[in-house]
């Protein structure tokens, strides 16, 4: 492990963000709070927003330090982030094609009528994926991989562990079928490799952010526009 960045209570808290989010999300379903779409979406947003704030606040030193370095060669680094997003997306979409799945758009209903009860949940749902990279990159790419970069065999083991856990963390996106999570695991390994190569968390974070924006946020905006334009 990097001797200059010793493990602290903050790292422990960051590791528990995702398990807490998944547990609370499951409790919402058990308690029947997901029956109301608007209420469920707002509650899920609050859960993810809390996780986002926790990760950003507790890892602000890492994020601030790496962002200063990122800005020094912004166009080069952003270009690498775009390339990373393409590779990340290519692995995921290639895997979906291989397994003949279409989770990226299967839950989008372009025929739903426009109303406050439908547009608001859709809008909120489009924002949530933009917060996810901040938590997932600090957890899977930094805490569970990059911290261990100076220990050869542990580094390799943590690359596998972090990538597998990254894929499993998205089980809800793939109908809880493990084989369908394999492309996400490989995509996570690709982001870890990008982070290791350049030594800057923002390169992988922006790559993840760009992918989520392209396949979640912008389709959501398009859906809202179509519904509102339809005047229904």
Please name every model-derived segment:
Residues 33-35, 64-132, 224-231:
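Juxtamembrane helix-loop-helix connectors linking adjacent transmembrane helices
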């Amino acid at each position: 492990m990097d001797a200059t960045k010793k493990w602290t209570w903050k790292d422990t808290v960051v590791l528990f963000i995702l398990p807490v989010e998944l547990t609370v999300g499951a409790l919402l379903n058990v308690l029947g709070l997901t029956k109301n779409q608007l209420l469920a979406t707002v509650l899920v947003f609050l859960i993810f927003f809390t996780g986002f704030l926790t990760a950003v606040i507790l890892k602000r030193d890492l994020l601030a330090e790496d962002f200063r370095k990122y800005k020094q060669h912004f166009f080069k680094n952003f270009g690498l982030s775009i390339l990373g997003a393409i590779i990340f997306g290519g692995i995921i979409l290639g895997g979906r094609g291989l397994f003949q799945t279409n989770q990226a758009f299967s839950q989008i209903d372009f025929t739903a009528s426009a109303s406050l009860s439908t547009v608001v949940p859709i809008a909120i749902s489009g924002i949530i994926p933009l917060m996810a990279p901040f938590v997932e990159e600090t957890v899977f790419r930094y805490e569970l991989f990059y911290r261990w970069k100076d220990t050869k065999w542990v580094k390799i083991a943590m690359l596998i562990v972090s990538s597998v856990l990254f894929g499993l963390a998205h089980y809800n996106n793939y109908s809880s079928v493990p084989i369908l999570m394999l492309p996400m695991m490989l995509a996570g390994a690709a982001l870890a490799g990008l982070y290791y190569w350049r030594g800057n968390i923002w390169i992988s974070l922006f790559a993840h952010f760009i992918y989520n924006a392209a396949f979640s946020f912008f389709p959501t905006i398009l859906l809202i526009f179509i519904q509102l334009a339809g005047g229904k």
